[in-house]
Design a protein with these regions (language model features):
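N-terminal signal peptide c-region/cleavage motif recognized by signal peptidases
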Residues: 22-24
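N-terminal small/polar-rich segments of proteins
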Residues: 26-96, 128-168
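Residues that form or immediately flank small-molecule/cofactor binding pockets and catalytic motifs
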Residues: 44, 102-104
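Predominantly extracellular/luminal cell-surface or secreted proteins
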Residues: 72-76, 98-102, 112-116
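Extended, solvent-exposed segments with strong compositional bias
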Residues: 104-133
């Protein structure tokens, strides 16, 4: 008999909303959002899926702003080497997984999205905001993967990962 595991949303990322600038005449606001990442049913073979991370920034008035940012992800319940989803009902069980930044499925294990520690990477970039121009949008691909291995107890598994955005 096959065991089917239905992982829930892997990454429930807390979105950060920041208002920064050098004063009331030089300000901008940004919204960070993540699409849902659902890996489907796990039956022992590696599975992966992807979602989009989107950063939208709007100029608040005044002159021009040069914006540099970093988006870092927490390890969730596990650690960066191997994140872990917990079963949401009894009996307790876990399911290993990880999150990757802009990686292709064949090279997932080389781009773990974290906070820059322990060999992990974070999403970074820069752009200019000009007074009166349209908002600036930047996107990154968030990959999630469950490695091949024994299937745990059937059920819903989830983890909560916190996203932190830094403006430099």
């Amino acid at each position: 008999m096959k065991s089917y595991v239905r992982p829930g949303v892997v990454a429930r990322c807390a979105a950060a909303l920041a208002l920064l600038g050098s004063g009331p005449a030089m300000a901008f606001s940004c919204n960070l959002s993540f699409g849902s990442l659902n890996l489907g049913a796990f039956v022992g073979t590696q599975i992966s899926s992807f979602s989009q991370a989107t950063l939208v920034c709007t100029h608040g008035g005044g002159g021009n702003e040069s914006v540099s940012f970093q988006v870092r992800l927490s390890p969730g319940v596990g650690n960066y080497a191997q994140r872990q989803m917990n079963r949401t009902s009894a009996p307790a069980d876990t399911l290993p997984y990880n999150l990757y930044l802009n990686a292709l499925p064949a090279v997932l294990n080389t781009f773990v999205w974290g906070d820059g520690s322990g060999g992990t990477l974070f999403w970074s970039g820069n752009f200019n905001l000009n007074n009166g121009n349209s908002p600036v949008t930047r996107t990154a691909t968030l990959w999630g993967a469950i490695p091949a291995g024994p299937a745990p107890s059937a059920g819903v598994y989830q983890d909560t990962v916190v996203a932190t955005i830094l403006f430099l």
